Regions:
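Catalytic Walker B motif of ABC-type/P-loop ATPase nucleotide-binding domains
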Residues: 157-161
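Conserved ABC ATPase "signature" region
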Residues: 103, 113-129
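Helix-to-loop junction immediately C-terminal to a conserved catalytic motif
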Residues: 57
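Hydrophobic anchor residue at the start of the ABC signature
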Residues: 146
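The feature captures the beta-strand-to-loop junction immediately N-terminal to the Walker
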Residues: 42-44
């Protein structure tokens, strides 16, 4: 896993806040995303993870705050040239087969054709290429969405719940695929609620609770912070660290 160097931050999120009526979904959220890393956004259901992804991607307008790319503020429209967002639970072009969806996406986004066959093999999509998207199981659809993301040309890939719908073996294979396709000029930002999966694939973590960032850092940094806050030693398991900090 890569080491974190603050000087290598490719994206900086500064003071993002978002409310829906009287409900504060995000409250002064700030963190950095570094080039060539897998950053995990970790939080319980309802913590604001999806809202944060949508605001960072420019799909939702934040009430205040800014997103910087290489120290330059970037508005919502221009973010699409830098960020590619893969939402959870969507069914793109449901009547079309997997092969059509991937080929169309490659052409529309000017995607990474050089890794097309490798991504298909890594995500075991070959048997599904002629199957309509609507006929896929939840796990099969998730693997197709992961392929769409990996083939996108943007340097920063945001994936909401990359392991949702996958069994244990598939989750491990998906994590290995993400790690395999991580390059020095590419960054993956993953929203995950499965703590065990996050600990295995991510280099650093942003912990979100109640719409606020409660901690950010590598696992050893978060473990030390959790022990300091708890006032006593804690097991090394990420689950215990997460519970202590949130």
């Amino acid at each position: 896993m890569v080491a974190h160097d603050p000087s290598q931050a490719v994206v900086r999120v500064d003071g993002l806040s978002k409310s829906y009526g009287r409900v504060r979904a995000l409250d002064d959220v700030a963190f950095s995303i570094c080039t060539g890393e897998i950053l995990g956004l970790i939080g319980p259901n309802g913590a604001g993870k999806t809202t944060l992804f949508e605001c960072v991607a420019g799909l939702e307008a934040a009430d205040r705050g800014a997103v910087f790319f290489e120290s330059v503020p970037v508005d919502g429209q221009r973010r699409s040239t830098k960020l590619f967002y893969v939402p959870d639970g969507i069914t793109p072009w449901p009547e079309q087969p997997v092969s059509w969806v991937l080929d169309y996406s490659l052409g529309f986004f000017a995607g990474r054709r050089g890794i097309y066959q490798q991504v298909i093999a890594d995500l075991a999509l070959s048997p599904l290429m002629r199957v309509p998207i609507r006929a896929l199981s939840k796990g099969q659809r998730k693997r197709t969405l992961l392929a769409l993301g990996l083939l996108a040309p943007q340097p920063i890939l945001l994936i909401d719940e990359p392991f949702e719908g996958l069994d244990l073996r598939q989750s491990r294979e998906a994590a290995a695929t993400l790690r395999k396709h991580l390059t020095p000029d590419r960054t993956f930002f993953l929203s995950i609620h499965q703590i065990a999966d996050a600990a295995k694939v991510c280099d650093r973590f942003v912990l979100l609770s109640g719409g606020r960032v409660v901690a950010e850092g590598k696992l050893d940094t978060l473990t030390a912070l959790a022990r300091q806050r708890a006032g006593h030693s804690l097991p090394a398991a990420f689950e215990e660290v997460f519970l202590a900090l949130t």
